[in-house]
């Protein structure tokens, strides 16, 4: 019989392995901790891909959202930071819009993928992020239409993907007002909910612990979109110019959160100089009382996996339940 202390310790491990998207930076500047993000009521995963929660997490479809919207320009470097987790899997990013008012957008409907980061040399993106302060940087596409958007950050945990419905979805949505240069749309797009299926081979992986080759893995959601007649898709850490963040921390205070956040940001080699020189990285709402913080510039590349992470998945992770 298990002792109460052992059971309690197991439950604590399961909960602390869960995660939320809690901060982002635009060209190295953040509007604040949990600012412009629709925060869910807990850090538990979404399990039902057919539910509305697959869009922006629990309560993420409630409008008006009561969340401020942060300004950005097409092509800007976006850094997201998540809570630490040992769960293996990819990270992807989508946009919903343009809309007139992001705070009134439910997120139910058409999304287009702007970034995906899967693995490097047999190490999952999530494990690489864990070695780099759980931060990851990509660029918004060019050729976008101006307007307000929902930015959906998705971490798919595959440690229980050997059973149908076992994959865990960690999702957070931020509100952005993006200035673009085109009136054209971005595509291809997918429907959420609708285009994710629990039995898709990218979601249900029976052999995840038995010889599965993650270098052959293709995440759900289709191809990364392109925008405008002469625009481009986003540039993420899966490309040759992308980089992952280092484990450099700085305290970030917020009037809406009493906790402390570690921050780190990177830019791709093609935009590094503009990131450092940008004077219009972000325009927080005047109602935002959080401190706007600059992120450190120390970088590590994501072209090789850390030596400490040698396996695709850790068997012990599948004990974590929602």
Swiss-Prot record:
Q: Which residues form a coiled coil?
A: none
Q: What EC number(s) has UniProt assigned to this enzyme?
A: 1.14.99.56
Q: Which residues bind O2?
A: 159, 168
| Name of the protein described by the UniProt record | AA9 family lytic polysaccharide monooxygenase B
Cite the cofactor comment: Binds 1 copper ion per subunit.
The organism is: Botryotinia fuckeliana (strain B05.10) (Noble rot fungus)
Question: What does this protein's UniProt record list under function?
Answer: Lytic polysaccharide monooxygenase (LPMO) that depolymerizes crystalline and amorphous polysaccharides via the oxidation of scissile alpha- or beta-(1-4)-glycosidic bonds, yielding C1 and C4 oxidation products. Catalysis by LPMOs requires the reduction of the active-site copper from Cu(II) to Cu(I) by a reducing agent and H(2)O(2) or O(2) as a cosubstrate.
**InterPro entries per record:** AA9, AA9_LPMO
Q: What induces it?
A: Expression is not induced in cellulose-inducible conditions (in Avicel- and wheat bran-containing complex medium).
Q: What class of enzyme is it?
A: oxidoreductase
One molecular function GO term is: metal ion binding
Enumerate the glycosylated residues.
53, 68, 121, 133, 197
List ligand-binding residues for Cu(2+).
Answer: 18, 87, 170
Q: Which family does it belong to?
A: Belongs to the polysaccharide monooxygenase AA9 family.
Q: Which cofactor does it need?
A: Cu(2+)
Q: What is its main location?
A: secreted
Highest rank taxon of the organism:
Eukaryota
In terms of Pfam families, this protein maps to: AA9 (PF03443)
């Amino acid at each position: 019989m298990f002792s109460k202390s052992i059971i309690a310790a197991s439950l604590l491990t399961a909960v602390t392995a869960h995660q939320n998207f809690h901060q982002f930076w635009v060209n190295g500047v953040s509007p604040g901790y949990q600012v412009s993000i629709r925060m869910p009521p807990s850090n538990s995963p979404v399990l039902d891909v057919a539910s509305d929660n697959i869009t922006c997490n629990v309560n993420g479809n409630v409008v008006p959202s009561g969340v401020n919207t942060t300004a950005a320009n097409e092509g800007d470097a976006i850094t997201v930071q998540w809570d630490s987790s040992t769960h293996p899997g990819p990270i992807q990013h989508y946009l919903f819009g343009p809309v007139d008012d992001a705070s009134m957008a439910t997120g139910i409907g058409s999304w287009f993928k702007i970034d995906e980061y899967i693995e490097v040399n047999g190490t999952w993106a999530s494990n690489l992020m864990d070695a780099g302060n759980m931060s990851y940087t990509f660029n918004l596409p060019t050729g976008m239409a101006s307007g307000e958007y929902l930015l959906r950050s998705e971490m798919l945990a595959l440690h229980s993907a050997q059973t149908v419905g076992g994959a865990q979805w960690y999702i957070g949505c931020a509100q952005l007002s993006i200035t673009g240069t085109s009136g054209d749309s971005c595509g291809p797009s997918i429907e959420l909910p609708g285009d994710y299926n629990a039995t898709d081979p990218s979601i249900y992986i029976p052999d995840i612990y038995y010889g599965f080759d993650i270098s052959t893995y293709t995440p759900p959601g289709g191809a990364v979109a392109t925008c405008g007649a002469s625009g481009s898709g986003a540039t993420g850490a899966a490309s040759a110019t992308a980089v992952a963040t280092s484990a450099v921390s700085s305290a970030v205070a917020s009037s809406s959160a009493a906790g402390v956040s570690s921050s780190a940001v990177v830019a791709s080699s093609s935009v590094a100089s503009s990131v450092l020189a940008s004077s219009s990285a972000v325009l927080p709402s005047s109602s935002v009382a959080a401190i706007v913080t600059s992120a450190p510039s120390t970088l590590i590349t994501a072209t090789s996996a850390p030596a400490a992470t040698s396996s695709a998945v850790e068997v012990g992770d599948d004990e974590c339940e929602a």
